[in-house]
Amino acid sequence: KENSELWFSWNPDQPTDPIDKLLRGKDRIKAVVVEANWKDNPWFPEVLKNEMEQDKKRNYDKYLHVWEGKYREIFEGTVYADEVRKAIEERRFTSLPYDATRKVETFWDIGWADYTSIWFAQVVGNRFHIIDFYQNRMKPLNHYLSTLQNKGYIYGADWLPHDSDKHDPVSGRTYKEVMLGSGRDVRVVPMTTVEQGIGAVRTIFNRCYFDEHKCETGIYHLKRYHYDDKPTPEGLKSTRLPVHDEHSHAADAFRYLALALSDAEPRRKLNYRKRNVV
């Protein structure tokens, strides 16, 4: 109806939440959004101010979310809570331009009904620049190879999981042989336990810098990757493993990245003169 108005009041949680995408997203409808918090309350009581100051000292993430209305960054029971918190404090979720003088390596978790997830990384000295992320499902391998080609990066190795001998449902050939046949430099990450992979991620995470825009979806999944909090039945050995859900695939691909790069030496820039590139 003409001149109708709809009023919403909400506490932001994630930029992917429907209400946020509707009213604050890049394709938002015609809307007026006003951010209001404790600073806008002229009758803000001293008892709440004291509680707020305590939260600020004890749990800064909670303070930002509850009192300042920022998106929630850290979640209870998440696998990489400490690593993510430190990356936020050190501003390692940032803007990372692609360096055309360095090769891009890709790290895959392969699925069909589940997601195929791919991280794109460059080794810059002692740092790992995670410059891009892509995932999709129910797509043939050629779709992903075309996506890589269209990004225009100069590629190094493609790191596949240990089960890369599974067959592409469309071509009937294995992922590994199709990629080798297309001229890709294919490497296979050795099989390890999930715990070993998580340990590798913890080891290298402080060397990782992420492009917060191109890796937004992947970062979201890393933040949400969480342990199963179901109690272990009496008499059984406790096996605290992450839940297998929609966040697992990006996290699995990142484990392969960590395992592949754990022993990476600092990489030099490409010498275009030696490669006869103008």
Predicted feature descriptions by range:
Residues 7, 32-34, 106, 159, ...:
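Hydrophobic/aromatic beta-strand patches that form the interior of the parallel beta-sheet core
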Residues 119-243, 262-278:
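Mg2+-dependent endonuclease catalytic cores in nucleic-acid-processing enzymes, primarily RNase H-like
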Residues 23-28, 85-89, 95-97, 177-181, ...:
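Short, conserved catalytic or adaptor-binding loops enriched in Gly and charged residues
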Residues 1-60:
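ASCE P-loop NTPase helicase motor core
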Residues 244-265:
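Acidic, Mg2+-coordinating catalytic module of metal-dependent nucleases/exonucleases
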Residues 96-135:
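Acidic, glycine-rich loop-and-beta core segments that form the ion-binding/anion-interacting portion
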Residues 9, 36, 67, 118, ...:
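A residue-level signal for conserved active-site and pocket-lining positions in enzyme catalytic cores
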Residues 42-110:
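ATPase catalytic-site recognition across NTP-hydrolyzing enzymes
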